[in-house]
């Protein structure tokens, strides 16, 4: 009788033990911007900017941005033939976007926005790079929603996220 019970109890104890180990090993591996006390950096393509109940948020697709030697290395790993043909990452940068998950991030009311190029006048002939130009969040929203002259959704953006809220948006210039 004792052998029959131990035959059932032992597998249950082993399963319980394994589930505790598995649960313990996954605790802390999840990145949750809301629980982190330090700022996080993410590079994204912004898909939409929305306002709901007076709060502004963006929906974005996180990417991996590489430049210089890192771009050449990743490009060669992912496209050896292309890298051999042209000798390195095109234009000195490389974007990896293996996951098309969209995430919505709230934006702080006092978030800073830094641009490299955008439509200042409504004339395509006037487009010119102005490195690290600070604009207001309202200007950014206005410019982002204008797509007739220059589509800002085609640029990557570096976000600083503090306590789950975007505090800084920096446009990455691409040639």
Model-flagged regions — what are they?
Residues 2-28:
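Sec-dependent N-terminal signal peptides of Gram-positive bacterial secreted proteins and lipoproteins
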């Amino acid at each position: 009788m004792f052998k029959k019970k131990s035959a059932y109890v032992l597998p249950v104890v082993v399963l319980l033990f394994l589930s505790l180990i598995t649960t313990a090993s996954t605790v802390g591996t999840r990145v949750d911007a809301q629980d982190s006390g330090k700022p996080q950096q993410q590079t994204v393509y912004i898909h939409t900017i929305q306002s709901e109940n007076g709060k502004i948020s963006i929906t974005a697709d996180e990417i991996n941005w590489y430049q210089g030697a890192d771009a050449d290395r990743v490009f060669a790993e992912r496209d050896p033939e292309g890298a051999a043909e042209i000798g390195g990452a095109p234009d000195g940068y490389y974007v990896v976007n293996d996951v098309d998950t969209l995430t919505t991030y709230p934006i702080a009311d006092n978030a800073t926005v830094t641009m490299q190029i955008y439509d200042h006048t409504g004339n395509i002939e006037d487009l010119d790079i102005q490195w690290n130009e600070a604009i207001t969040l309202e200007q950014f929203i206005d410019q982002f929603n204008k797509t007739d002259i220059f589509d800002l959704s085609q640029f990557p953006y570096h976000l600083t996220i503090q306590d789950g809220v975007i505090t800084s948006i920096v446009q990455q210039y691409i040639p």
